[in-house]
């Protein structure tokens, strides 16, 4: 969607007097918030559900970055160093990691943390999917039914498959890798190392100095950078061969070109990389990350 049109305006209840709970994206907080729509006019930042709002608009604002400006090694009035060559643009170093949000399958994922290389100003050394829980304790252990004999369906995160899977919990003891729903499990544990992402992306910081030459005061602007990241295992499957003779236009995700492409499905069997619409394919297989 057009972010400027559907996500950036402040909510507008409109002139009518109806009472329709709706959701709008607040660019200042980076969150979808509820408001009351009157029923007519208003603007496009008006979404029927929170899920719809987050799918269209969720972007995390990176306003809390901390920068360590270079030290002025050549202060004015230092006559002993007045003839030394001084670099006009000393490097800018980042103290903190950058965090962005991602949406896949119409729900927000956990934060991607992009770690900046020490003393480098143009790329990042690692990207990983993290959550607020202790991964070693809540996600890494194998599921444990416990000694009791109850029959309680639960979910656990399997680090080998990278998926949340169901198991039967006995009702007592066990370990922390034990969730009531698949959604909670994925929220806490779903993470994939993104080493294949091409992390030396085109993130080039533009330095802006004040009028006093060599001053340590500096601000850094960061442009939007997009990454397409495949997270769903079915998206790595090849296009399924046409075994049957049906003619059903479908879409599959091409992991080489990192795009969804059209193909003709024969009508029988499938490896999961088979989608009715282009939108369904992209929602399942592509994550748009924005710094």
From Swiss-Prot:
Q: What InterPro entries does the annotation carry? A: Kunitz_BPTI, Kunitz_BPTI_sf, Prtase_inh_Kunz-CS, TFPI/VKTCI-like
Main location, first listed in the record: secreted
Which residues carry attached sugars according to the database record? 95, 111, 119, 210, 217, 228
Any keyword Repeat? yes
Pfam assignment, any one = Kunitz_BPTI
What GO biological process, any one, is recorded here?
envenomation resulting in negative regulation of voltage-gated potassium channel activity in another organism
Q: Name one GO molecular function term.
A: serine-type endopeptidase inhibitor activity
Query: What keywords is this UniProt entry annotated with?
Result: Disulfide bond, Glycoprotein, Protease inhibitor, Repeat, Secreted, Serine protease inhibitor
Does the UniProt entry include the keyword Repeat? Answer: yes
Which parts of the sequence belong to the BPTI/Kunitz inhibitor domain?
7-57, 139-189, 235-285
GO CC annotations on file: extracellular space
The cysteines covalently paired via disulfide bonds are 7-57, 16-40, 32-53, 139-189, 148-172, 164-185, 235-285, 244-268, 260-281
PANTHER family the UniProt entry points to: KUNITZ-TYPE PROTEASE INHIBITOR-RELATED, TISSUE FACTOR PATHWAY INHIBITOR
Which protein is depicted? Kunitz-type serine protease inhibitor 6
């Amino acid at each position: 969607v057009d972010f400027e049109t559907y996500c950036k305006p402040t909510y507008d209840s409109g002139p009518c007097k109806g009472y329709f709970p709706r959701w709008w994206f607040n660019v200042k907080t980076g969150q979808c918030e509820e408001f009351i729509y009157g029923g007519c006019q208003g603007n496009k930042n008006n979404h029927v559900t929170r899920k719809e709002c987050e799918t269209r608009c969720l972007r995390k604002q990176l306003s809390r970055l901390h920068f360590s400006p270079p030290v002025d090694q050549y202060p004015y009035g230092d006559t002993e160093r007045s003839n030394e060559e001084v670099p006009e643009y000393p490097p800018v170093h980042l103290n903190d990691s950058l965090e962005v949000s991602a949406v896949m399958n119409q729900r927000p994922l956990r934060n991607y943390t992009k770690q900046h290389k020490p003393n480098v100003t143009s790329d990042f050394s690692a990207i990983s999917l993290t959550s607020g829980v202790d991964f070693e304790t809540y996600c890494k252990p194998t599921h444990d039914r416990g000694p009791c004999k109850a029959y309680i369906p639960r979910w656990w995160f399997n680090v080998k498959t990278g998926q949340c899977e169901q198991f039967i919990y006995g009702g007592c003891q066990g370990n922390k890798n034990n969730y009531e729903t698949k959604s909670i499990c994925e929220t806490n544990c779903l993470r994939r190392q993104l080493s294949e992402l091409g992390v030396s992306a085109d993130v080039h910081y533009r330095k802006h100095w004040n009028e006093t030459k060599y001053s340590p005061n500096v601000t850094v602007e960061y442009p939007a950078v997009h990454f397409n990241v495949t997270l769903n295992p079915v998206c790595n499957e090849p296009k399924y061969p046409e075994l049957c003779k049906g003619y059903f236009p479908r879409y599959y995700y091409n992991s080489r070109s990192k795009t969804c492409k059209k193909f003709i499905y024969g009508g029988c069997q499938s490896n999961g990389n088979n989608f009715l619409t282009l939108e369904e394919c992209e929602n399942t297989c592509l994550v748009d990350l924005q710094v």
